[in-house]
């Protein structure tokens, strides 16, 4: 494994809690006056010299498999007997053959051997097994000296970018704390909403709510009622309650438009670098659908100005989701 110790970004956590500003670039900026014959890497993080935006150039991933609608289990690399699952399993992880970052930083998490399952259809027991694996892999990757932050995530649906339809998620291990994650998990960062109009479901230890100012028309956050930093810090009851909430919320989302809704899901956890003692674990789920099979595209004014226009009122979404429970 590569040691990126000297290549880590130094991050300054401002006292005002605004977040993290990148002080040192890990990679050279694009050299517009350089030798045109210089080899251009297929996988390289770059930083916009004006906006400070980090963009990972991942040309090598253009060749990855694209089988979003495959129905034959014999063709699926994630089904038992397939390329990535030669033996029977309940849950399974492996290093991604088509990584977005070098150094064994990208892993795939298989939720179930059932090709036609969804995350929600696994039930509480099945989702709990996935959470256990998420926690295990988060801590294993975070123990590496070249890892500062671990992001667990899932893309569901071909329209979101999933290239294989078998139920699975992924994990990325960063050698720095991305700016958004630093803001959420840092001082004066994210905490659960106190607005009862936005909370729509809960159990003994977890609560689900619609964010106050969501970018996407469908957006939900699930979090512990008491502050916990990472998945591994949840006790057995907490993990069970999180599994219950995930299965519940994902089922409601599919009922929202009477269809399997495409979504993006990710887990915000405390980074492994210092300065994040106040981090509050949460799971975000968003979908671009503003109606059945009708996505809301983030358009020119939003991309250009960096301000967004959401046609769905958060309080109304929360009320609808509340009505869709069992």
State where each predicted segment sits.
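Intrinsically disordered, low-complexity segments enriched in glycine and mixed charged residues
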Residues: 1-11, 35
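Active-site microenvironments that recognize anionic phosphate/pyrophosphate groups
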Residues: 24-27, 31-166, 172-231, 237, ...
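N-terminal non-cleavable signal-anchor helices
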Residues: 2, 12, 19-23, 28
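Gly/Ser/Thr-rich active-site loops/lids in small-molecule metabolic enzymes
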Residues: 239-245
């Amino acid at each position: 494994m590569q040691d990126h110790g000297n290549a880590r970004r130094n991050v300054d956590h401002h006292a005002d809690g605004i977040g993290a500003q990148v002080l040192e670039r890990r990679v050279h900026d694009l050299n517009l006056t350089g030798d045109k014959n210089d080899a251009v890497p297929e996988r390289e993080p770059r930083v916009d010299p004006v906006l400070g935006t980090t963009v990972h150039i991942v040309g090598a991933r253009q060749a990855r498999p694209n089988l979003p609608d495959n129905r034959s289990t014999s063709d699926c690399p994630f089904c038992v007997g397939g390329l990535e699952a030669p033996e029977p399993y309940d849950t399974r992880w492996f290093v991604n053959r088509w990584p977005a970052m070098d150094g064994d930083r990208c892993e795939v998490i298989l939720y179930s051997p059932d090709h036609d399952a969804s995350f929600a259809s696994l039930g509480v027991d099945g989702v709990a097994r996935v959470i256990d694996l998420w926690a295990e892999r988060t801590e294993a990757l975070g123990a590496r000296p070249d890892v500062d932050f671990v992001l667990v995530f899932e893309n569901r649906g071909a329209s979101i970018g999933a290239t294989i339809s078998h139920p699975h998620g992924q994990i990325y291990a960063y050698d720095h704390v991305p700016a958004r994650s630093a803001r959420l998990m840092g001082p004066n960062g994210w905490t659960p909403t106190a607005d009862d109009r936005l909370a729509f479901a809960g159990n003994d230890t977890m609560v689900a709510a619609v964010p106050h100012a969501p970018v996407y028309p469908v957006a939900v956050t699930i979090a512990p009622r008491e502050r916990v930093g990472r998945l591994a810090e949840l006790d057995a009851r907490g993990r069970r309650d999180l599994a219950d909430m995930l299965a519940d919320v994902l089922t409601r989302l599919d009922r929202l438009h009477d269809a399997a809704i495409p979504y993006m899901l990710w887990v915000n956890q405390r980074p492994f670098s210092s300065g994040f003692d106040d981090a509050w674990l949460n799971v975000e789920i968003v979908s671009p659908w503003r109606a059945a099979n009708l996505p809301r595209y983030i358009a020119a004014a939003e991309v250009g100005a960096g301000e967004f226009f959401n046609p769905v009122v958060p309080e109304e979404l929360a009320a609808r989701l509340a009505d869709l429970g069992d």
